[in-house]
Amino acid sequence: GWATTATEQGMGAMAREAARWVIGPRSFRRLLPAFGWLGPLAMGRTSHAFVAQVKAILEVDESVAEQLEQVHIPTLVLVGNQDILTPRGDSEEIADRMPNAELVVISGAAHGFMVEHATTFNRVLLEFLGRITKAQRAAVADVDAKAS
């Protein structure tokens, strides 16, 4: 796996191997010339830190999922419909467990959707933040009106 590759061959080799998992097939071909960012990004951390991250992800248990029900703040859950690292079903479960979560599935995107579909990602995020800001302002105005 990636942890073994990182440990035995270094972070550069891991980044090359991971790229095909993080970016969808069509986007991979389109973005291949721009992949210069992935190597330095991966090289910025040690293989030890990466292996610890992989281990932590693999050790997550059901108690973490159960705690999601306690998250009541507005939450945006994003997933690419071609994401094989964190599949759509996982994101659906996360959103279903959180009382104020909104799920958005980005068509044609894999795990690296914020890079491969940056325009869509930014639009969806800004729209969500705009709705949250508007709702918070309305709530504050309502409290102020009741206090008067």
Where do the protein language model's features map onto the residues?
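Conserved alpha/beta-hydrolase "acid-adjacent" motif
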Residues: 84-90
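Short, conserved loop/helix-junction motifs that constitute active-site signature segments
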Residues: 68-72, 97-98
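Acidic, amphipathic alpha-helical patches
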Residues: 64-68, 91
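Hydrophobic "lid"/C-terminal helical patch
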Residues: 18, 54, 94, 121, ...
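Hydrophobic, aromatic-rich cap/lid helix
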Residues: 38-65
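Short beta-strand/loop motif that positions the catalytic acidic residue
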Residues: 71, 77-79, 83
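Catalytic active-site module of serine/aspartate enzymes centered on a nucleophile-bearing elbow/loop
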Residues: 100-148
